[in-house]
Every structure is written in structure tokens, then in C-alpha cells.
């Protein structure tokens, strides 16, 4: 053993003696590896005043970061606050009924439409009878739709897309739906579960289309998106954390699909769950991806750049300034941010927005406005009344223009 240690030590000394250093005799870094400090000598007075920096010769790390912000990010343009409200009509709370995950709000004529996940009865988790009971609130769901004239009072119109026949890929549940109107047709994309809802079950994405928002809907016979197949479970127990290999970021499930017409193609944004998921940065290991097709019906090819986020949960994306904007919530180091990608793939943080509603259904008639957040003026969200039951609510967003104390009068 001693001889092995001495031999390894000698090898280390040889390697170190043969490795060029980055320092000269004085210990200063080599010119080729010096990290250049930005030049702060020519900062204009307006910028210094705006950032509250009075001595540019003595800059803290925080002040240097502030000076490095892109000029457009220093404004209030991408920052927003939210309020939520109960709705009337059939979206008021109904005992024993789950209504959740509303789609985008689509205006057809003078009528607003939304689609959503609907089920009945309590959920028993994986400790119940999986064959006959619900595992989650979104288990044993069908997709229903509702209409409204004012965005406040909603009428439940009925079933849009039902679960598939026994033995099909969507025979257990269809849920978390989104709608894309395009060229006179309507495309619903949604999450599916087939067979037994076990811990290791792999979710997929299905599609239905119609020439009328009221249906009838034609379902595709096969899923348009599936999880990656390069993860390897460890053992046969129903344990989603036990893996020999985790695989791609979406090796377990593909969730929350949202289809966008973009750059003369169709971008299917989705949430990925990985086999052997871990808790990182205080939240679940969730990331987003995109699959692209030339035709809305597919085939869809996953981007080589996936994952395109390192954080997030439900997909919430919209067009802006030739690119795609996204609200990223709930999980990961960049949760509670609004991001923007000029190419729909390479997203950068534009703002931090704590308190954003979950499972947002955007008002699509405000899509692609010059104002990046006009689409957030109002829309739909859901709320947990209890673990078993959720309701659909309305949210409204607005920029915070001033911070005013109570009682201060404004002109």
C-alpha cells in the first residue's frame, strides 16, 4: 500500500511539474486568462442617478450587477402584479366536482371559449384501489368546455374530448388541455394516461381537432409526443426515484402541452419530468422542452437544444416582438420569472414576478402585442379549494407604476 501511495505521489509531482502555470513570478495571472473588468469610467450621469450610484469609483458587487443589466431590463416593462377573483355561473364551486387547468381563452365572435380538465369524486393517492379509484384530481378526467360573454359568468357546455376506449393510450385520463386556433381549425393538445395509473406510468401528449369550437372533435389515433426512452429503472418496485440511469429531462413524463404557430412551423412546448427526479434549488427538477413540426398534426421532432428551460411548471407562452415569451413558475432556480427568446428556444430572464397564478389560461386575442404583458390583463387560473377539489378562477394583471402609502391622494 505504501509503495502505491509513493508511486501516485511521484506521478502527481511529475504532472504538476510538466503543467504550465497561469502565473508569472509575481503570482499575477497570465494575460491569456485574466478576466477583464468592465470599464466603468464612462458611465453617464443619468444611469448613475437612476441606479442610485453616487461614487462610480467605489462600486459594490451589487452595483456592478445593476450596471450590467440590459438597458431594457431596467424599466418596469416586464414586471407585473396579479389579483385573482371567483367566477360566476358554472365555474362557481360545486361540491364533488374538479375543474382545473383551463386552456387559453379563445374569442370567437362575441363569445369566449375555454377548455379544461373535469372529473368527479375524491382522490385516494397510490394507497387506494388504483383499478377503481382516482389517484390524483387530474386522474379519470375528460376535457370539457365552457363559454362566456363577459369573462365573468361561464356556462359549462359539456364534453369536448373523452377518454379513449379500453386498451388505447388515453383510456385512463385526458387532461391539461390547450387550444390553438389556426387557419379556420381548432387544435386541442392534452396530456394522456393509459392503463393503470402506477407511480412509474409514462404520460404522453394527444391531439384532437375540429372546424368548430363546439366540436365535434376528431382525435388522433396515436400520441403526438412521448417521453424519451433512454432512462433505466432500477428494480421492479413502483419507485420513481430508483433508477440505474435517469435519461433525458423528459424520460418519465411529457406534460402541459401548448401548441404555437411560429416561424411558419408549429412549436409544441411542454413540461418534462425525468426518471429519478430530484429536489434541486428547493423545488422539483422540472424543465421545459419544445418539439417542432411543419404541420399541426405532426410529426413532431424534439429540438436538439432541449431542455430550453432549467425551471418551471405549467407551460405559459405567448408571441412577442418576433419571439416567444414565457412565464416560468413554481420549480427550479429561475422560478417566478418572465423570460423571452428571440428564436423561441434560447430564453433569457426579463423580470422576476413572485405570486403569479398557476395553470394560467391566457387571453389569446391580446397575443403578440407591442406591450409584452398586455396578454396578462386578464385570463383564467385554478385554485385548490382542497386537495381533492379545484375551481377555475379569473386573474387580472397590471404593472405597478407607483408605491403609495395609504391615504395618499393622487391627481
Please state what every model-predicted region is.
Residues 24-411:
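Carbohydrate-active catalytic/glycan-binding domains of CAZyme proteins
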